[in-house]
């Protein structure tokens, strides 16, 4: 068993394990979940909170799919196969991507779930406009994201041969890819409420 501390010096990462660790050894952050009245903070919130929100939908969904994918962070993954399966079994024309985005200059804690107008990829404007109008009508707090970088499983939907609209909707975190990822509980709550609302209205 290897247990050590991560040391950051500029752009370089080091460990303090007393001997050399074999190349290719997979290390992970020790989990330390902290929850107070405003935030949840832990390692690996990105992905886990997207899954949490999707699991909440399993309690109420009537018509639709709740799909859990793998390897999105590595580019590609299970989405192409799953899209083929879905479109053969019970086709859909719309997809909402439940995941976590980043705090940026234009996206802040406690201001609601983030609806992404674009990241590295651009969903169809007519669809994102409809989502924004519906969420405005709902009164659920939300904020808009316009970025040139980043991505999600929406990429696989966009590049698929199927005529499907998609939109990324998720809470934002800061201290990304660290053991201290941090998400507002209010934003997470609005994320779950928005998904429940949109599944009824779309």
Sequence positions of predicted segments:
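N-terminal hydrophobic/helix-forming segments and targeting peptides
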Residues: 1-202
């Amino acid at each position: 068993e290897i247990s050590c501390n991560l040391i950051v010096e500029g752009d370089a990462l080091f460990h303090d394990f007393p001997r050399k660790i074999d190349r290719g050894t997979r290390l992970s952050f020790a989990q330390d979940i902290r929850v107070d009245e405003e935030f949840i903070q832990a390692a690996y919130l990105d992905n886990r909170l997207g899954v949490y929100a999707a699991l909440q939908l399993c309690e109420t969904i009537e018509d639709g799919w709740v799909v859990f994918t793998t390897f999105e962070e590595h580019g590609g993954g299970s989405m192409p196969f799953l899209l083929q399966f879905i479109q053969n079994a019970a086709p859909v024309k719309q997809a909402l991507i439940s995941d976590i985005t980043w705090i940026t200059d234009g996206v802040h804690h406690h201001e609601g779930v983030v609806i992404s107008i674009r990241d590295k990829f651009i969903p169809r404007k007519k669809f994102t406009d409809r989502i924004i109008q519906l969420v405005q009508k709902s009164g659920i707090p939300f904020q808009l994201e316009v970025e040139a970088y980043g991505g999600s499983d929406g990429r696989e939907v966009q590049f698929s041969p199927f005529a499907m609209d998609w939109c990324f909707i998720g809470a934002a975190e800061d201290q990304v890819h660290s053991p201290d990822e941090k998400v507002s509980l209010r934003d997470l709550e609005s994320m779950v409420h928005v998904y429940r609302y949109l599944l009824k209205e779309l």
